[in-house]
Amino acid sequence: LNLFYDEATVVRLLLRMRWKTPVLLITTVLVLLPGANARAQVSTDDSTFDAITRQGIDEVYNLKFEEAEKTFHQLVILRPGQPAGYFFQSMITWWRIVIDMEDTHFDDRFLEGMDFVTDMCDSILDKHPGDVTALFFKGGAIGFKGRLEFHRNDYLSAANAGRKALPIVQAASELDPRNYDILLGTGMYNYYAEVIPSEYPLLKPLLLFVPRGDRAKGLEQIAIASEKGKYASIEASYLLLQIYYYYEKDYGKALNLAFKLFKRFPDNVLFHRYCGRCEYSAGDWPAVRAVFGEIQQRVRAGQRGYNSGVEREATYYVGLSKMIQKNFDEALVDFYRCDELSRLLDTQEVSGFMVMSNLKIGQIYDLQGRRDAAVQQYKKVLAMKEYQDSHAQAEKFMNDPATY
């Protein structure tokens, strides 16, 4: 169906956004899947529309937000009564959030945009309940709103909305079961529905009323979407990267995906950071220093997304690489900077970067024969909130000086 609103209907929807109270928001990590699927379903016979969509998606992933705004505005002009253009415009706002999750001032704009897309899809589905495009964009709007709520620690609303969103995903899958892009959504559900209860026991009660997942099947489905998806292959590859890195601990596969994505989108700070993280996990210290050193250069150049939080991470890992190479004086400079940045950034609680940088400073002091200064550092670490085994390490080095 080629459905269009008249101008009056679009204006009415826009006016409603001024007063509409957002409903309970969506999804645990399970329901990131509608968002990816919505992006996947720009199915159209219009080659111009298709080409514009691909161009805009690439611009978003490469953080070319101004260019993407212009590109997706063309979608709105081409099809003002369909949700695609409005949804993708909000994806620009989403990536503005993603590259700096501590910054909340884009939240309201994003939520309002997703509400508008949901309203538009509901109006289409009221007349045509089997409209696949409307189902996917509605699922996308719900999923991305929930994803933000999950990041903002509103887990109850996320789980409740995940329950609401699941039937939308199932309906869309039944309508188009052979679409490889859909496998991203079903794969995400299958994977995370099994993983979350074991990885996050506190969230287990929130998942009692949703179907059980299948970790292996989900991973296979996401991999297929990554290889064969038309529009969702990038999202699927990024998801696979995160899964291999955080849950499967397969750092070789994660590293390959990170460099593949970064090669295609060389201005994407998240893909860049994962290259460095994976090199660290693989134990390649020269590569760690090279990747995070380049990130430091981009921070100094003021490149988009390369903010103080990124600088802190890069500085910490560069410091570690120098420490491994016994460049202790240079490593101290990096750890001092990491501590300085942490004191600026840690507004809620002490971060792992602050804890570990202070622990490393103490170890270096020991290695330099500055025992009294080292002991003072370990006392500082013990006074901080524990991160991993930081207290055990500090107590150990209090009794026995660190050695190389």
Give residue spans per PLM region.
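Residue-level detector of the short coil/turn that links helix A to helix B
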Residues: 63, 153, 213, 248-249, ...
